[in-house]
């Protein structure tokens, strides 16, 4: 292929000049730059400036580059290793192992990270529920197999812990393959997750791809595509159902904003890139169910300043089948996972998909919680005594439901000292139906905290009564 030379370096942006009589590289083509120390830097063509000069974005640090260095046009986009050999391994955006394990040789199967979304006639039109073992999710915002789910929340409300628990439950409960993509998050968290997953035994069913906070914006913008490409191989070639975790999709948008500014584009609303909707669509449209297999994507979405009207989370909303909203007020009450049962939604919450009994229990739980929410102002001003008997009953049951929506997580057991609970969907429906019917009105409220099925609450109430009797 043709060779060029560096004419300008501005941070992570490298301008490369090619001879005008040679064929210029296409947009998204990978270029290799051999530094003086022998290492190779990969950049990706982003813009044509004219007169044979291409503006490229570096996938690693640009230290050691100088004007005049030769640049090789690879003639293809970045490609990454795929297949069973990726399971249990950790990669960077280029598909290079970063876990100290064996390198992938030239014969390893690879796929380009830039690919078209599946065609309409390849899509699977059926809707199937994915059981997660987490009560609040399975009951009130059921996840669709092959769907896209957003975990919304500000800093420190538990998005990453919830993702870890979902990986744990899907690997243990469904023996499913997962691809975890760390986009622009803390390196410490990525390291902790690697060792936790290795210790719990789920790593052997998971491929991990990291482009963390310390990486250049080009790597953070493309690492989501690297993880998606690995997942697409298992779906399209192996015919498997795959879970794709992206933590954090906001950082994908943020990196795109940085790259857009470096390329000299005029910013759009709130300083975001004008191509925000296009970039998000190109990623999200590849995440879907086909007739061969499915990719179910669970994406943590950081909400800047807890503002859901910010263009980044608002653009993500349009692509989602279900949303799990994490609420800081619930963490202050000690309710984990801090999922807001009224703000979280799912397109699958319909009787023709989940069944009439599940639908009736879920909507009644929401009605009771909504009524409790409406009565809270009266309670705070006038007290419980001013409520009617019926309203007092609703409040008491709503508080039990609110506490019962909490659940101990396996991945958080070292912090909480409690063993994690996986609750089957039928047990979840049965338990909440019993609370709504008033079967457990005599149990103390605190017995419902951090339980699995309702039998745990009954046992906890018995222990509390025994402790009081012994005192």
UniProtKB/Swiss-Prot annotation:
Cited InterPro entries: AAA+_ATPase, ATP-synt_VA_C, ATP_synth_F1_bsu, ATPase_a/bsu_AS, ATPase_alpha/beta_chains, ATPase_F1/V1/A1_a/bsu_N, ATPase_F1/V1/A1_a/bsu_N_sf, ATPase_F1/V1/A1_a/bsu_nucl-bd
Binding-site residues, ATP: 153-160
Enzyme Commission number(s) from the entry: 7.1.2.2
Swiss-Prot/TrEMBL keywords: ATP synthesis, ATP-binding, Cell membrane, CF(1), Hydrogen ion transport, Ion transport, Membrane, Nucleotide-binding, Translocase, Transport
Gene3D superfamilies in the record: 2.40.10.170, Bovine Mitochondrial F1-atpase, Atp Synthase Beta Chain, Chain D, domain 3, P-loop containing nucleotide triphosphate hydrolases
Pfam families found in the cross-reference section: ATP-synt_ab (PF00006), ATP-synt_ab_N (PF02874), ATP-synt_VA_C (PF22919)
Recorded topology in the membrane: Peripheral membrane protein
Locations listed in the record: Cell membrane
Cited CDD domains: ATP-synt_F1_beta_C, ATP-synt_F1_beta_N, F1-ATPase_beta_CD
Recorded catalytic activity of this chain's protein: ATP + H2O + 4 H(+)(in) = ADP + phosphate + 5 H(+)(out)
Source domain of life: Bacteria
Keyword ATP-binding belongs to the record: yes
Record note on quaternary structure: F-type ATPases have 2 components, CF(1) - the catalytic core - and CF(0) - the membrane proton channel. CF(1) has five subunits: alpha(3), beta(3), gamma(1), delta(1), epsilon(1). CF(0) has three main subunits: a(1), b(2) and c(9-12). The alpha and beta chains form an alternating ring which encloses part of the gamma chain. CF(1) is attached to CF(0) by a central stalk formed by the gamma and epsilon chains, while a peripheral stalk is formed by the delta and b chains.
Family of the protein in this entry: Belongs to the ATPase alpha/beta chains family.
Cited function: Produces ATP from ADP in the presence of a proton gradient across the membrane. The catalytic sites are hosted primarily by the beta subunits.
Descriptive protein name: ATP synthase subunit beta
Organism: Levilactobacillus brevis (strain ATCC 367 / BCRC 12310 / CIP 105137 / JCM 1170 / LMG 11437 / NCIMB 947 / NCTC 947)
Encoding gene, per UniProt annotation: atpD
